Amino acid sequence: MNLFHYYTYFKSFRVIDREELSLTCVLLAYKIRHGFIKLEDTNVLYNHLKSINKGKSSGNSGSNAKSANKTSPNLVNVEMELLNFLGYDLEIELPFVYLSSLRRKFNFSNKTENLIINMINDSYRRPLCVFFHPRTIALAITFVAMNALSEDNFLMNIYAFIKNDMEYIKDEFLPCVEILLNLLESKMNKD
């Protein structure tokens, strides 16, 4: 609600309708609190908001299968405008930038690199870039991937690397690893 009121107080609605703005605020609040949510999962809420605005009964909003599949095509643009308005830095550095230097440093296998790339892609489902530096994310993912594939001979190198070369990420390394392990565990449970 704070996002919605803050935005509507300082901005006009120009091309954004209230349903899209409301849903975007709900999505952002959910992402901040819990992590990634698929846009398809918002269809029912979007149609419910549309039906309330048109004066329809809220009980019929989920009954029509055709309308339940309709979502706002503009939702991502509204989210970007809202984040931009709030001053959020939309130029986010990606963990991929550090992958080649980690590959040179630890000389891990192609299998490990593929797992690392998949885990970096999956990490976008959690707001890791908001909480951790991309270098920390890349290093934590490398650690988890090497641990998952039992490349024990390299694990001590990572600890030494953190201790000697990257002292400044030491405090955020273990919390990032914990989140990634939970992500990997939940993904393995789904498969």
Per-segment meaning from a language model:
Residues 1-177:
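Structured all-alpha helical bundle cores of eukaryotic regulatory proteins
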Residues 176-191:
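C-terminal regulatory segments
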